[in-house]
Design a protein with these regions (language model features):
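A short alpha/beta connector and helix-capping loop motif
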Residues: 92-110
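Acidic (Asp/Glu)-rich catalytic clusters
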Residues: 15, 53, 96-100, 193-210, ...
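C-terminal active-site subregion of NodB/CE4 polysaccharide deacetylases
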Residues: 1-81, 88, 119-139, 220-327
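Structural detector of well-ordered beta-strand residues that form the stable sheet scaffold
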Residues: 103-107, 209, 273-276
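Extended, charge-rich helix/loop segments that form flexible
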Residues: 15-17, 116-204
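Alpha-helical scaffold elements lining the catalytic groove of polysaccharide deacetylases
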Residues: 182-185, 189-207, 214-241
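Short beta-alpha junction loops
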Residues: 110-114, 280-281
Length: 327
């Protein structure tokens, strides 16, 4: 007998004591990729969804947020989300979700639909296809990188991404262009969804949310530019789907580092119902609906998956209890 459904019910009881777990994914790969081992392949994702269905009552995110505020969540409530808008979300993740009778919300960075490539993927693919085992990026301030083993390539990718992630958008784009020039590689054009796939995703019963146009770090932008990024992505999706878009995901998503409280207020003023972050945690009735935490389940055994979620609920419960006691 699997103990986790019963154990999760003790920390996520529903009703007045309702709590919401929101899972975060980006890609689901057709097969394992040693260079991006943080993304599950189809077999792993299928197994994860089996565990999620066993342990949780999965709700569409908009319904879950509404029921959280109404204090009418079922026990063990959860929602599933994907960020960015990768084509494999439609091609691989969607059929697996449907096979389990599950729904998810897909947050789309609209500027990369129809053949675009996000900056981080341009870097990953440039390093993947680099024809030398020693990559010298010192001329652009990014050092010299050993590419002789899978482990060293993975380390180099992480270091380069970390070095340029929080640059101003124009500086970041220039760095990426320089990397492509030095490695003599071209970006892929098949990584992201098409507009037709987004429409088909919605018609299949999945939810669609906004994720800005160009996936900038909002905290790096002036207020108007940040507002335009959010508003333009919302308008694009509303025009495409002929319906209101009420959900948003902050790019990168770390409070204070990647977005500011002024950005939270912008999201509220633009008429969104809820927004999700990448801060780890569990939402309860004290959570700001414009800053709902999420969790990436990386564990590869059912026991560890359940144990980590149970522990996260306990920590979050203790944190919120302390907050209430201090009021």
């Amino acid at each position: 007998m699997n103990p986790w459904p019963l154990l999760m019910r003790t920390v996520s009881q529903g009703g007045n004591k309702g709590r919401l777990s929101v899972f975060l994914f980006h890609r689901v790969l057709s097969e394992p990729d040693p260079l991006v081992n943080w993304d599950p392949d189809a077999v792993t994702f299928n197994e994860l969804m089996g565990w999620v269905k066993l342990c949780f009552n999965v709700l569409p995110l908009d319904q879950a947020v509404r029921r959280l505020s109404e204090r009418s969540l079922p026990p063990r409530a959860a929602s599933i989300t994907f960020d960015d808008g990768y084509a494999d979300n439609f091609q691989i993740a969607r059929p697996i979700l449907e096979s389990h009778g599950l729904t998810a919300t897909f947050f789309i960075a609209t500027g990369y639909l129809n053949g675009g490539t996000m900056w981080n993927d341009r870097v990953i693919e440039a390093i993947r296809h680099c024809r030398t085992s020693n990559l010298d990026l010192s001329s652009i301030g990014l050092g010299i990188h050993d590419l002789s083993t899978v482990a060293s390539v993975r380390h180099s990718i992480s270091e380069i991404l970390r070095s340029i992630k929080h640059l101003q958008p124009s500086q970041r784009d220039k760095s990426v262009s320089n990397i492509l020039a030095i490695t003599e590689t071209n970006p892929r054009s098949d990584l992201m969804m098409t507009s037709d796939q987004v429409i088909a995703m919605r018609q299949a019963g999945m939810q669609i949310g906004a994720h800005t146009v160009n996936h900038p770090i909002l905290a790096n932008l002036e207020s108007k530019a940040a507002c335009d990024e959010v508003a333009d992505s919302k308008c694009f999706l509303e025009d495409l789907l002929k319906e209101r878009i009420g959900l948003f995901a902050y790019p990168n998503g770390k409070p204070d580092l990647d977005y500011r409280m002024s950005d939270v207020e912008t999201i509220r003023e633009l008429g969104f119902d809820a927004a999700v972050t990448t801060a780890w945690g569990v939402a309860d009735d004290t959570t700001d609906p414009m800053q709902i935490p999420r969790f990436t389940p990386w564990d590869r055994t059912r026991f560890r998956f359940g144990a980590r979620l149970f522990q996260m609920h306990l920590r979050s419960k203790a944190h919120h209890s302390g907050q209430k006691a201090s009021r």
